[in-house]
């Protein structure tokens, strides 16, 4: 007999606080802390990252919801009252990343900050939040793969609590949440190990490495998931977007190295710190 973990952390009256929300909040705080710490080294003030957080997080969630609704329009067109019911689930990371990137670019333009440098600074924190955030999916028993045997999970040498949590409605499922979290953790370690090496990254290239790594990981993990969003009924949206992003990163990297010749990442913003508005 298996015993699944309770997705509800605690309740206050009729209000239920889920582990998913707590884990996502911890991921946001971790990303903010990492960005502020690295930003100070690159002559970007902490106030800027706090302000970016206040704009980026809510708009990012809206973008994640809009993305999900668009690709599930067949359902939501019949249930328009559920479009805003985000508490019932249904957000997509790529939608949040796209919305967040737009907010960041506009923010940098308004604050006269170098956008590629800011993207470099926040990328590792975002990746850390993604590593952590997938465990929210674990608590909800979602974002899993196809059915599998108990022996399959045991052969992965997983802790028993993970095996138990992958037992859903009478069947075991592949823990694709864990695959994505693990390989993103590897990518995060690589980025954090390399980003401070001299004459390795131009500004914008830490972000590009993050985007390329995540695109490859997501492409393969998405192929194993059972809850993918589709276009034309046959193409997995996240796989298509991952491939497009990977191609775009390669083109942008070559173009900027050959034509633009940006500053080195370690040179920072060049702003006198702390600077005045």
Swiss-Prot record:
Molecular function in Gene Ontology: phosphatidylglycerol-prolipoprotein diacylglyceryl transferase activity
Membrane topology type: Multi-pass membrane protein
Presence of keyword Phosphoprotein: no
Gene Ontology cellular-component terms listed: plasma membrane
Binding annotation for a 1,2-diacyl-sn-glycero-3-phospho-(1'-sn-glycerol): 134
Subcellular location: Cell membrane
Pfam families: LGT
Annotated pathway: Protein modification; lipoprotein biosynthesis (diacylglyceryl transfer)
Enzyme Commission code(s) on record: 2.5.1.145
Alphabetized UniProt keyword annotations: Cell membrane, Membrane, Transferase, Transmembrane, Transmembrane helix
Nuclease keyword on record: no
PROSITE patterns reported for this sequence: LGT
Transmembrane domains' residue ranges: 15-35, 50-70, 89-109, 112-132, 174-194, 204-224, 234-254
Recorded superkingdom: Bacteria
Gene Ontology biological process terms in this record: lipoprotein biosynthetic process
Enzyme class, UniProt record, top EC level: transferase
UniProt similarity note: Belongs to the Lgt family.
Function text: Catalyzes the transfer of the diacylglyceryl group from phosphatidylglycerol to the sulfhydryl group of the N-terminal cysteine of a prolipoprotein, the first step in the formation of mature lipoproteins.
Identification of the protein by name: Phosphatidylglycerol--prolipoprotein diacylglyceryl transferase
Source species of the chain: Lactobacillus delbrueckii subsp. bulgaricus (strain ATCC 11842 / DSM 20081 / BCRC 10696 / JCM 1002 / NBRC 13953 / NCIMB 11778 / NCTC 12712 / WDCM 00102 / Lb 14)
